[in-house]
């Protein structure tokens, strides 16, 4: 059985790497591009990009440290190789997409290492836990993307690695064995780094740190000794905080050309603690994480966690003081069991994050590691294997391939068009208009940031009338003339098949049309009747349509 589990883990690990390089076409959320690679591509490679509001000095809500370490380091290496002539033509839309993802994919194997190390401590079967981890579509898709939540999950996992020996006993020891002193320094670094990456990291760290503190207090003989132990965390935390503040201050000061100290976590909290600001990003019911997002990400594993929590709560309620001392001791034993601790690690951050009205599924991806440890006990086989496999296949297909799946291939197609040299030697002006899609990450077009003849327009979910008016304006724009000389102009509209009827209302003549399959817009899914018709493929495709533009001719000069 162990050999079979090792083969399964190895197969899923290989799939994780190869699918990253393929690459995955699914587009989960704009934050995977606009909180890291889009910004770093503009800063380091000088390409045309859209800078989100969080990365302006006046509204600096995101630390630049982790974008610099991930996307930034990747783009710097690409630029260096190209400048040295080691790999001419290396920088392309494909490399700008896959480079940062490949780095995150490599870092995701730190999860596997951590689970391998943690499983014996928490009474989990090591290889069953690794199979659950590597086979989860959350690992295959979310942990290979440039989300700040991905970094948060990696830091939370290694926080568990550092505190677990001080909370539970190892199979070879009768009591918890805290690690060496430098572990506490590193723990302080992780706490500060996690807070600067996403202040919500404190919600994930609360339960492990609290249990670590309780156990250390009981071992050291009181609160005073615990305080002295906790002070050991301060040097690492202070060092990481100073480095983050210094990096953010240097970065945002260079953008604003003025010196100042920038505390990005404070700005993040100030913004997100305002309910009106959260409402702009979407308002959800308080039970969304518990009743929807947990199932969406983890499927039957979330159901197992809910069942285990109910059983644990029911057992504790039965062991009340009126039933005798032995029952009380039994209740304490339940509360101090590995299962109880893992349930705390899972449900404490989930419930704390539920206090906020804006709840997205990706906020919960750091909970994957404690969940797979909880659901792979050494004494029991993994239940519902078939359901679990089917669920993860479906999740991987939807979020890794289908969801907004035509947009990244569409940008690659447009990159080839705008970089094809004109045989006549004249410069062509391109207008790329996106409507009813997620924001297009412009850095994947690999356009020069200075004087680019390509204009990218994001219309969002514009109404039909607004779209037609915009097309009418762009087809007759003054940009098609430069210093009185005519420019060849090409106008492209990128829209899902479910919205193509809006373009037909505008009555613009079409020059050509390219369909990119598959593309599913969950915000505007195709009707069931259209999927059952013969045109189902058109409704599940992204349409890249070139419109005929009026020929702009140079007006003859008036004779004197």
Swiss-Prot record:
Keywords: Endoplasmic reticulum, Glycosyltransferase, GPI-anchor biosynthesis, Membrane, Transferase, Transmembrane, Transmembrane helix. One of its GO terms (cellular component) is endoplasmic reticulum membrane. It is a multi-pass membrane protein. InterPro entries: GPI_mannosylTrfase. It is an enzyme of class 2 (transferase). The chain crosses the membrane at residues 102-122, 126-143, 147-167, 186-206, 225-245, 333-353, 363-383, 388-408. GO terms for molecular function: glycosyltransferase activity. Pathway: Glycolipid biosynthesis; glycosylphosphatidylinositol-anchor biosynthesis. It is found in: Endoplasmic reticulum membrane. One of its GO terms (biological process) is GPI anchor biosynthetic process. The keyword Membrane applies. Its EC number is 2.4.1.-. Alpha-1,2-mannosyltransferase that catalyzes the transfer of the fourth mannose, via an alpha-1,2 bond, from a dolichol-phosphate-mannose (Dol-P-Man) to an alpha-D-Man-(1->2)-alpha-D-Man-(1->6)-2-PEtn-alpha-D-Man-(1->4)-alpha-D-GlcN-(1->6)-(1-radyl,2-acyl-sn-glycero-3-phospho)-2-acyl-inositol (also termed H6) intermediate and participates in the twelfth step of the glycosylphosphatidylinositol-anchor biosynthesis. The presence of a fourth mannose in GPI is facultative, suggesting that it only exists in some tissues. Belongs to the glycosyltransferase 22 family. PIGZ subfamily. This is GPI alpha-1,2-mannosyltransferase 4. The gene is Pigz.
